[in-house]
């Protein structure tokens, strides 16, 4: 139980996963018997993390969110203000997407993110979606705020 509580990938950002899955991972049972090399899958998440870091670093300067609180912002039309706010807030959200992407990459690199094999178009594909910190695209395109709980840290 202590190893579950102090597993390094939970301490990073607190990505949620079940004890049952962790126990199967430690005991190398079920889908964890023969884990393939996770290098490429984890590097994809690292690349995503670095892209989000770049968006945060550069995007915040190009489209400053602070402009939304200036007196000049009220002079624009309502549709312009809505679109500007959404675009300007994305680099701030990328600040949070970045560590969750890095943690997901670390979990996949450890092998814990392996979810077995899925057949796609008569071809077997390894699935690395057992533990995902954030589905950023789904979070950006949801209709209801309640849906965030499905795509972030679950």
Can you annotate each of these PLM segments?
Residues 8, 15-18, 22, 39, ...:
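Alpha-helical interaction elements in eukaryotic regulators
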Residues 22-46, 137-141, 145:
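Helix-loop boundary elements of multi-pass alpha-helical membrane proteins
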Residues 35-64, 79, 83-88:
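Long, well-ordered, tryptophan-enriched scaffold segments
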Residues 26-29, 59, 63, 67-71, ...:
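Membrane-interfacial segments
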Residues 1-22, 27, 60-64:
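Transmembrane-helix bundle segments that line or gate the permeation/cavity pathway
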Residues 1-5, 71-154:
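Membrane-interfacial catalytic/cofactor-binding modules of polytopic membrane enzymes
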């Amino acid at each position: 139980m202590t190893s579950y509580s102090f597993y390094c990938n939970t301490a990073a950002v607190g990505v949620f996963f079940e004890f049952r899955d962790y126990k199967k991972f430690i005991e190398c049972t079920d889908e964890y018997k023969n884990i393939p090399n996770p290098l490429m899958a984890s590097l994809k998440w690292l690349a995503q993390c670095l892209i989000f870091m770049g968006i945060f670093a550069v995007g915040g300067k190009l489209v400053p969110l602070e402009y939304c609180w200036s007196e000049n912002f009220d002079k624009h039309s309502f549709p312009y203000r809505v679109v500007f706010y959404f675009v300007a807030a994305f680099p701030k959200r990328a600040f949070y997407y970045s560590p969750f992407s890095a943690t997901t990459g670390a979990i996949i690199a450890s092998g814990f993110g392996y979810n077995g094999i899925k057949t796609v178009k008569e071809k077997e594909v390894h699935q690395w979606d057992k533990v995902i910190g954030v589905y950023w695209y789904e979070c950006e395109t949801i209709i209801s705020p309640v849906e965030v709980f499905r795509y972030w840290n679950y």
